[in-house]
Amino acid sequence: MKGSFKRLIAIFMLFLHMVSLADGIVPDNGVSKNLQLDKTANGVPLVNIEAPDNNGISHNVYKEYNVDGRGTILNNSKDLTNSQLGGLIYGNPNLQNSSEASTIINEVSGVNRSRIEGYQEIAGKKANYILVNPNGIYVNGADLSILEM
């Protein structure tokens, strides 16, 4: 009986650890006040990036930034646009009073490394893309698509 309970606890801890690795994308709302997460009709995570500054740089800060096999879309479009991963997506509400970004910086402020295991797509205007994580970035089966519509 005692051994079964220990095994049960060990299995629970293993799954708990796996869940923590799959946190996905978690904005750091203390820094990125307008960064918004959504999903497309087919379930692909959609990030409405922050409006760019006067130099065209959209700086987005996350506690966690992980991309699973479904991929992730970074919405850099003011208008309705078509994406490879998610089909038709609406315009980014953060860009309605500004231009689209020419550079997108995704910075991780949390303590975990990023796991990039799927496609990342910039939908809308083409932009340079920078992912910064001082804890490291694990890449497996990743790609970056930059579409201009």
Name each model-derived stretch.
Residues L21-M149:
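Solvent-exposed adhesion/ligand-recognition segments of exported proteins
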Residues I9-S20:
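Bacterial N-terminal signal peptides
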Residues M1-I9:
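Bacterial N-terminal signal peptides that target proteins for export
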